[in-house]
Amino acid sequence: MESPEDRNGNDVRQPLLEKIPVKKEAEGEERLCIDEMLQRYCGEFGRWQLKHFVLTCIAWALEAFHTMVMIFADQEPEWRCVGSDCRVGSLNCELDPSSWEWTAGKGSSTVSEWGLICGDKYKVGLVQALFFAGCMIGAGVFGHLSDSKLGRKGSLTVVCIINAIFGIATAFSPNYWTYVVLRFLTGFSTGGVGLTAFVLATEPIGPSKRGVAGMSTFYFFSAGIAVLSGIAYVFRSWRELFIVSSLPSLLFLLIVIPFISESPRWYLVRGKVDEAMKLMHSIAKTNGRHIPAGVTLALDDDVENNNGERNTAVEGSLKDVILSPLMRMRLVISVAISFTVSIVYYGLSLNVGNLKTNLYLNVFVNAVSEMPAFAITAVLLDKYGRKPLSIGTQWFSCVFCLVGFSVWGAGPWKSVRMVSGVLGIFGMAGTYNLLFIYIAELFPTVVRNAALGCATQAAQMGAILAPFVVVLGEELPFGVFAVCGLVGGGLAFYLPETLNKPLYDTMFGMHEAESESNRERGEVIC
């Protein structure tokens, strides 16, 4: 077999794609992998992909609703004195319950309704921790199910059903512990929303457009937070807020899901070649393109070895990833980076949220401020690659967190710490979102969502720990965040670059391609 250098004149931007097309002369059939068919016949990002991408990514806004609603529902409202024994400046824990009252009434938040203050204040943090614990479990479960029998679309449908049911049910919680259970169950389904929607939205997109498209998915999450702040401003009762923020999941099921297609890659690895080809023809037709007769799809390892058409499903699991030295190292590093990045991202977000400002305006501004990070990262992603950008954004955040840790005292130094926090989260927001693209490209289709699920679980563990880092004070958390950024950036050195590489379908196909690429370039990578 000819090497890519012989055929392409040393074009290192496409080291694997040109060797994939194989014509079976006896049958007059040309068998291509999905990336090659998108590039040659269907279009990498046309009208079909744009519509599918936008509809699928609406799910990210739903995830923002179910996750960030706790900021408003669990807030501690303002209170006022109503008796002569109440003194301005006192803590309400020190006062007789009859001498003060909640300004907005007892039903404005869970804190005011169930008295989650003083000795019971820890219960607010407990709800948050258990929600993210549910996310961690759900990410693993739905990551596996979306790679296996349910598929990407099936998993997205299931998690939206669960979100709608338990999200609305939460509004009718009769007591605190029922509320805790329902938030945990909502977290379980929410953990599967983002990773399933991300893979479903990006898998039908060609390799040269996939990076920018992948980064663009996170605009929907930030937009969801911004919209939620407006909804919370209008609906001040926590029960009303849960109903209004959960109804969009029901509308998504009824209006949007029917117009979303399953991933052609999932069809292919499950042995459903006819369904995959039908979808590819639909993509080509909508994009104003045409797939010639005699052209069909094949898995990358079938194409590589010129095998016949496969009609059986190709299975993959985390066990296969762990047993493979190549995949195992990638998974361990991906999990570690996701954990450290999440601590910094959520930790800095909570630090900014602790500012004594208008809560609704503050949440809105924080959501909007992340968008420039997404835009800049998207522009640089295909110019400099995933690996350098992952290292650079984490170390950018590390530098400003180190500045925040180094300056002590009040006065102007508080402003320096605030600016350091904003710039720190600016860098880490780019990393946090870049990781979805990077990790998705590091693993083949048969285990892609399972690997993303593991990384998401690690990120949720970081989210659980972040509040405990924040309570260390004003300066010490910056030191922890700086160390996390430094370590995460260092670990990224051990990952391979995936820019302009195809998305592989099977473990065998990825192993063969990576081994040949290493031999040709004389490199050893994870």
UniProtKB/Swiss-Prot annotation:
Cytoplasmic side: 1-52, 145-153, 201-214, 262-331, 382-390, 440-451, 497-526
Keyword Ubl conjugation part of the UniProt annotation: no
Source superkingdom: Eukaryota
Single GO term (MF): transmembrane transporter activity
UniProt topology in membrane: Multi-pass membrane protein
Extracellular face of the membrane: 74-123, 175-179, 236-240, 353-360, 412-418, 473-475
One Gene Ontology cellular component: chloroplast thylakoid membrane
Chief place of localization: membrane
Family to which this protein belongs: Belongs to the major facilitator (TC 2.A.1) superfamily. Organic cation transporter (TC 2.A.1.19) family.
Entry protein name: Organic cation/carnitine transporter 4
